[in-house]
């Protein structure tokens, strides 16, 4: 080895293993108070009744085939509109072309991710 690399005694086997041991035994960093408050705010927003999302609307709908919630959502989403007519007719299958399929999958993905806010226009 080159002498300049080993000038310090930090690279000895004992010092290296001690540094690794210390790193492993260190407790995980606690999230900051600001991060914790942001998480609390997000949970409160999700749990408030004022912020009704498509997922909560569909879950709380007691009509057969969830038609009432789909009627409300069909004013906002083409995918919901594509699902509404076959659901109202109680069809056993839903025929969709390629574009309608993409729209329905996008709608269902948004419902699953809980990202659609319901806008009631009455």
Swiss-Prot record:
GO terms for cellular component: host cell nucleus. InterPro entries: Baculo_Ac102. Residues 1-35 are annotated as: Disordered. It is found in: Host nucleus. Its main location: host cell. Keywords: Host nucleus, Late protein. Coiled coil: none annotated. The keyword Cell wall biogenesis/degradation does not apply. Nucleocapsid protein that mediates the translocation of G-actin from the host cytoplasm to the nucleus, which is fundamental to infection. Participates in regulating nuclear actin polymerization as well as the morphogenesis and spatial distribution of viral capsid structures in the host nucleus. Suppresses 'Lys-48'-linked ubiquitination of the viral protein C42, thus forming a regulatory cascade with C42 to control P78/83 availability as an nucleation promoting factor (NPF). Interacts with protein C42; this interaction suppresses C42 'Lys-48'-linked-ubiquitination and subsequent proteasomal degradation. Interacts with proteins P78/83 and E27. This is Protein Ac102. It comes from Autographa californica nuclear polyhedrosis virus.
């Amino acid at each position: 080895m080159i002498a300049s690399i080993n000038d310090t005694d930090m690279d000895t086997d004992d010092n290296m293993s001690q540094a690794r041991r210390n790193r492993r035994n260190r407790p995980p960093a606690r999230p900051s108070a600001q991060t914790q408050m942001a998480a609390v705010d997000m949970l409160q927003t999700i749990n408030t009744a004022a912020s009704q999302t498509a997922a909560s609307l569909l879950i709380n709908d007691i009509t057969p085939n969830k038609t009432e919630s789909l009627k409300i959502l069909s004013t906002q989403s083409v995918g919901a509109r594509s699902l509404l007519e076959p659901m109202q007719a109680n069809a056993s299958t839903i025929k969709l072309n390629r574009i309608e399929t993409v729209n329905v999958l996008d709608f269902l993905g948004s419902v699953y991710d809980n990202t659609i806010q319901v806008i009631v226009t009455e």
